[in-house]
UniProtKB/Swiss-Prot annotation:
Cited function: Catalyzes the N-acylation of UDP-3-O-acylglucosamine using 3-hydroxyacyl-ACP as the acyl donor. Is involved in the biosynthesis of lipid A, a phosphorylated glycolipid that anchors the lipopolysaccharide to the outer membrane of the cell.
Name of this protein: UDP-3-O-acylglucosamine N-acyltransferase
EC number: 2.3.1.191
Protein family (similarity comment): Belongs to the transferase hexapeptide repeat family. LpxD subfamily.
Organism in which the protein naturally occurs: Xanthomonas euvesicatoria pv. vesicatoria (strain 85-10) (Xanthomonas campestris pv. vesicatoria)
The gene coding this protein: lpxD
Catalyzed reaction equations: a UDP-3-O-[(3R)-3-hydroxyacyl]-alpha-D-glucosamine + a (3R)-hydroxyacyl-[ACP] = a UDP-2-N,3-O-bis[(3R)-3-hydroxyacyl]-alpha-D-glucosamine + holo-[ACP] + H(+)
Pfam families, sorted: Hexapep (PF00132), Hexapep_2 (PF14602), LpxD (PF04613)
Annotated GO CC locations: membrane
GO MF annotation, one: N-acyltransferase activity
Keyword rRNA-binding: no
Entries under InterPro entries matching the protein: Hexapep (IPR001451), LpxD (IPR007691), Trimer_LpxA-like_sf (IPR011004), UDP_GlcNAc_AcTrfase_non-rep (IPR020573)
Length: 337
């Protein structure tokens, strides 16, 4: 597919600087783009690459347009504009409707004639797969699940039981949705299992990364509202609620019954203690541990910044002495009084 700069600008409301007839057939980074490819400049640190890039068209802000040596497309947010343009060239393989001969489907399950069910798929009792859905190779849909219109389970996705997916949900390989929550009670020195009788509800337009686990609720459902984006290797425990338009980076763990607001961003390897609440529009930076509820929007951190090992060891040794030092300072203050 080849598109002119003018056609792209018209489709996405951008401004052309230079030759609008310039054609592009793909996308790439500034450093590696070649003839006929489109790139973008969003981070100022890459501005020096404008002078050397071979990109036919660059998406950038108005104040960077003078530095572009070829055709430019001016956008208020170049990264978002690039994402929309790149989607034009991201041509997914066509999945024809139909059920592969190796699939095993319970007689009580309902599969739309417009759905694609791949090899070695299993669909359990009373589950429903909507129109335009793609159920990839080796995926398992357990009992009483719903996969709504246009949703896609890539290879080896497991919906254990009582999982309801909204429209246009995309789940990447290896994810497990609806497994038992980690509910245990101690009885006479032995653990007994607390039955997990709830389910999982995932709203429209959500995306779940590879090997992520979302447990079903004990009594009430675990809920992800619409347009939540979850990276790979994330654990969301039972009874959690994640607000709409929030994004969670890889290796994050969210303990049971935590409630996270709308438009929140959780960096990589964040830990969230259970039974707390985070309000809307909160950013938690990577490696932080959230131990208390957050009631004010803003950016929060508790991770330890990287430093050289020798300095870190000195700081760690001093950290263990903080209580002694604090007592000494307090004592000196009292002596001066």
């Amino acid at each position: 597919m080849r598109l002119t700069a003018s056609a792209i600008a018209e489709q996405f409301g951008l401004t052309v600087v230079g030759d609008g007839t310039t054609e592009v057939s793909g996308v790439a980074t500034l450093a590696h783009a070649g003839a006929g490819q489109l790139s973008f400049l969003s981070n100022p640190r890459y501005r020096p690459q404008l002078a050397d890039t071979q990109a036919a068209v660059v998406v950038l802000r108005a104040d960077d347009a003078d530095a572009a040596k070829g055709t430019a497309l001016v956008a208020k947010d170049p990264y978002t504009a690039f994402a929309k343009i790149a989607a034009l060239f991201d041509v997914a393989p066509v999945r024809e409707p139909g059920i592969h001969a190796s699939a095993v489907i319970d007689p009580t399950a309902q599969v739309s004639p417009g759905a694609h069910v791949g090899p070695f798929v299993s669909i359990g009792a009373r589950s429903r797969v909507g129109d335009g859905c793609v159920i990839g190779t080796g995926s398992i849909i357990g009992e009483d699940c719903v996969v709504d219109e246009g949703s896609e389970l890539l290879a080896r996705v497991t919906l254990v039981t009582r999982v309801r997916l909204g429209k246009r949900v995309r789940i990447h390989p290896g994810a497990v949705i609806g497994a038992d929550g980690f509910g245990l009670a101690m009885d006479a020195g032995h653990w007994i299992k607390v039955p997990q009788l709830g389910g999982v509800v995932i709203g429209d337009d959500c995306e779940i990364g590879a090997n992520t686990c979302i447990d079903r609720g004990a009594l009430e459902d675990t809920v992800l509202e619409e347009d939540v984006r979850v990276d790979n290797l994330v654990q969301i425990a039972h009874n959690c609620r994640i607000g709409a338009h929030s994004a969670i980076a890889g290796c994050t763990g969210i303990a049971g019954s935590a409630k996270i607001g709308r438009y929140c961003l959780l960096g990589g390897h964040v830990g969230v203690v259970g039974h707390l609440e985070i309000c809307d529009k909160v950013v938690i930076t990577g490696k932080s541990v959230v131990r208390n509820s957050i009631h004010e929007p803003g950016e929060y951190s508790s991770g330890t910044p990287l430093t050289d090992n020798r300095t870190w060891r000195k700081n760690a040794a001093r950290f263990k002495q903080l209580d002694v030092l604090a007592r000494r300072i307090l004592a000196v203050g009292k002596e001066k009084e």
